[in-house]
Curated annotation (Swiss-Prot):
Contains two amphipathic alpha helix regions separated by a region of less-defined helicity and greater flexibility. This is Caerin-1.1. The lineage of its organism: Eukaryota, Metazoa, Chordata, Craniata, Vertebrata. Residues 1-22 form the signal peptide. The keyword tRNA-binding does not apply. InterPro entries: Caerin_1, Frog_antimicrobial_propeptide, FSAP. Pfam families: Caerin_1, FSAP_sig_propep. It comes from Ranoidea caerulea. The modification Leucine amide is found at L74. Residues 23-49 form a propeptide. GO terms for biological process: defense response to bacterium; defense response to virus; innate immune response. It is found in: Secreted. Expressed by the skin parotoid and/or rostral glands.
Amino acid sequence: MASLKKSLFLVLLLGFVSVSICEEEKRQEDEDEHEEEGESQEEGSEEKRGLLSVLGSVAKHVLPHVVPVIAEHLG
């Protein structure tokens, strides 16, 4: 009976250890995925900021010349 208890205890202990290792690996994979998602979102926001600054610069230089021409044709 004592050897059965020891064997059962050993099986349970090894089971808990393997479950703990699997949970740790899964947690690490989830953290890696979140970091990758964050990096891709940061790259997307940088692209948007770059595009908006280019559009703003173009509008700043082109609109003063275009608005009077449009006003002439409409008026």
